[in-house]
Amino acid sequence: MVNNPTAIEIQQTKLYQQWGLTDSEYELICTKILKRLPNYTETGLFSVMWSEHCSYKNSKPILKKFPTNGPHVLQGPGEGAGILDIGDGQAVVFKAESHNHPSAVEPYEGAATGVGGIIRDIFSMGATPIAILDSLRFGELNDNQTKYLVQEVVAGIGGYGNCIGIPTVGGEISFDPCYQANPLVNAMCVGLIEQKDIQQGKARGAGNSVLYVGAKTGRDGIHGATFASDEFAEGKATQRSAVQVGDPFMEKLLMDACLELILQHSDWLVGIQDMGAAGLVSSTAEMAAKAGTGMILDLDQVPQRETDMSAYEIMLSESQERMALCVRAGYEDQVIALFKGYDLDAVRIGEVTTKEQYQLWHQGQLVADLPVAALTDAAPVYHKDQAKPERLATFAAQAPYVPSVTDTQATWLALLKQPTIADKSSFYRHYDAQVKTNTVVLPGSDAAVVRIRGTKKALAMTTDCNGRYLYLDPHVGGQIAVAEAARNIVAAGGQPLGITDCLNYGNPEKPAVFWEFDQSAQGIAAACETFGTPVISGNVSLYNEFNGEAIYPTPMIGMVGLIRDIQDITTQDFKQVDDLIYLIGETDDNYAGSELQKMQQGTISDQLGHFSLATEKANQDLVLKAIQQGLITSAHDLSEGGLAVALSEATFKQGLGYHVQVDLASRQLFAETQSRFIVTVKAANQAAFEQISDQSAQLIGRVTAEPIMHIQTKDEMIDLTVEAAKDAWEAALPCLMKSEA
């Protein structure tokens, strides 16, 4: 057996620094909290529990700015996932998580275990997972390493979700140079639950038992939480030991067993929590902390797949497919028998105590004896310095970017080929989107839609964020991220209910990065107040840098909305010849951060144009009202690529064309002014629609049988066949993925 360093040796060699603790944090532990030197195992426990990934020590002051309450909120931040009331005794459960650093090192396993972890968060609440979504960011596809990352991440997401039998129904993929060495892999899971079955991760009741269930513990993922709380450098790209390895078939058994316990034997169960980041220590210490209790654990009882594991390794392992249960005394044998019936390990490893102390025994020795609060509530909270990035002053001094569009048709086709805009079906065809046969609107739409069996209702769900906008203006960009998510939900016929988030940023110790974080959070909060969408769960991923270069601020917004009647489900495709086409919202010369600017200049700059939350809300309310009154046959939000791209996307499914006339310069077809929709209305409903639109909708054309897109601008008439546009859009990514860099 390896002799671990003594407490004095840890202090003298500053080993704690390698595990992510600072000198001041170590001093706080020694002099204020324990009033002694922590031993090897205890130092390891502090290092992961006080990491940013677990403690949110840098982000807590920012997260407090989010609205978390609302009429539908049943569970806000603080548990495995958030929960919203959707009526009839039912609730929707959802959360998003990041797995950025692991996916950069081992993209398949990093992405797969990210999906597995977020699924466990959902069923730990007692909910049946019904959908997975993802939000992915990569560098440019002219790089072979990026192509490899894309292939492996997509395969990892699909491989895990498909095997476990949960449909991957939607998401988004964007490409920008800032993500070249630091990809973002954010996964979101949505579940359904009867409100009476809601569970919490609390270890209540002295004498109740702590059970370990699921897969055995190995050495994979040790210090994964610490790994996720540091930035990349050249030498750190090989930290594969910090990446977990997943088994979706084991997860399926674990999910089924947990749901059987919750739904059929809830009287046996006190609390349940996933062993995610920081593994066994995080799950058990948090369960005790939330209940105001203590815990004694016997680590010799923990099922292990490797020999001679130390207490440190057992506690910090992030082996996948494991859960911690608090079981009512006297029911241990029944619970163990239930899990063994699924061929899963199930072992009593400890018990709940009244004394709020966290004690670990291993091989007959007390290897850790800490106050529970020391690991959870006592973590320091930092109020970081802030400074406005210098680039913003440079952008403000520049003349506004106005694109030169000399060949409108060529520009239109070129935009359709841009990786962020182009057809993503070559990626999402790896996902089974229809397993369980509840998916009504498939990937590639504004929002995915999943029906709720036994009711007339459905859920709309989406993930959204444009990091370019946040790079130019974090506050307004944060507002736009929420606004676009809500716009997508509304376009599908849903009422936005709430959000989860993955807040992806660079190193918070840099004042400019922390300023971006704070400003964007304020923007998100303001938008959430406007749309009535509280933040009910989420995740913070900081230190997304490589060799000192940060990603764009990228706060991914995952939103869920309720479609009150499946008859309200609306899709983006034009459906019937002679339907009238309306543009809702004004179009200005907004090109800052646009796909056109990136395509023409190779970079982004300038100040974002004016954005009004009030206008956004009014336009969304109009569209939703029209949908619910049965006046709209299709709806599509305008985002990357502007009006020309949105109109094109509306033609691709049915192959219908259109005649459109707009009082715009040709270049404005590609402007990315916010708060806009295109909708189609039957001619018979024209008067009714225009009556409720109050002049905020402009009639710009009609749908035609001829598969040609005709657009008359103030400058010219542009014609483009649907076939040519669709071919360009569909072929772009497969060609890029096959080409040699």
Curated annotation (Swiss-Prot):
Q: Which UniProt keywords apply?
A: ATP-binding, Cytoplasm, Ligase, Magnesium, Metal-binding, Nucleotide-binding, Purine biosynthesis
Q: Name one GO cellular component term.
A: cytoplasm
Q: Which InterPro entries match?
A: PRibForGlyAmidine_synth_PurL, PurL_linker, PurM-like_C_dom, PurM-like_C_sf, PurM-like_N, PurM-like_N_sf
Q: Do you know which Pfam families this protein is assigned to?
A: AIRS, AIRS_C, FGAR-AT_linker
Going by the record, the broad EC class of this enzyme is: ligase
The subcellular localization recorded is:
Cytoplasm
Q: Where does Mg(2+) 2 bind?
A: D121, D274
Q: Per the UniProt entry, what is one GO biological process? A: 'de novo' IMP biosynthetic process
The main location is cytoplasm
Catalyses which reaction? N(2)-formyl-N(1)-(5-phospho-beta-D-ribosyl)glycinamide + L-glutamine + ATP + H2O = 2-formamido-N(1)-(5-O-phospho-beta-D-ribosyl)acetamidine + L-glutamate + ADP + phosphate + H(+)
- Molecular function as annotated in GO: ATP binding; magnesium ion binding; phosphoribosylformylglycinamidine synthase activity
Which residues does the annotation say bind substrate?
S98, H99, N100, H101, R120, Q244, E318, S319, Q320, S541
Pathway noted in the entry: Purine metabolism; IMP biosynthesis via de novo pathway; 5-amino-1-(5-phospho-D-ribosyl)imidazole from N(2)-formyl-N(1)-(5-phospho-D-ribosyl)glycinamide: step 1/2
User: Subunit arrangement?
Assistant: Monomer. Part of the FGAM synthase complex composed of 1 PurL, 1 PurQ and 2 PurS subunits.
Name of the protein:
Phosphoribosylformylglycinamidine synthase subunit PurL
- Recall the taxonomic lineage recorded for the source organism: Bacteria, Bacillati, Bacillota, Bacilli, Lactobacillales
